Amino acid sequence: MIQKHELPILEYDSNSEEVIRPNHGAEQLKLPEKCVYAFLGDAVDDYAFEAEATVAETFETITRNYPVYIVKQDGMEFCLCAAPLGAPAAAQLMDFLISCGCKKIISTGSCGVLTDLAENEFLIPVKALRDEGTSYHYLPASRYIELNKNIRDAIEHTLLVQNIPFQECVTWTTDGFFRETRDMVEYRKSEGCST
């Protein structure tokens, strides 16, 4: 059912009947349930090469093709894929991965910060201030989205067991990198955003 609004970005359709399915052209592809979806550029391809991963499929976009790797390691099989920059492209590729069988997806990468945070420390978002457009096509409009506490707890437990430092944060999602004005950054910081 469509939730209508004067501003199209705030409209939402809860009906999941897509015009084009995410696995269009790859209906027979069955990917592993576990997936690492990394915003790490060429490091993903480098790791896949070193791990002797196989390419299960190549996801084609108008700017770049993204190999979808299958890695076999320590008796486990998982999917590995580089995530594209930008919410629309990243969501499109993630939809494809999910439609082909990925159910447990962990994403990692780097980010900019608004406050003084230590480098080389994992940041675990607890909520996100939604200032981009893509998420509004997946969930009804709201200022924030809270991240699933069970998933967050599992990630934090794993990092604690491995003695890897981390910090929780509130993140600001935006599609306008060069429109992060001084005043807007200060405003977001006053709302508790640190990334």
Specify the residue positions occupied by each region the protein language model found.
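Accessory terminal and edge-of-domain segments that mediate assembly/interaction
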Residues: 1-104, 112-195
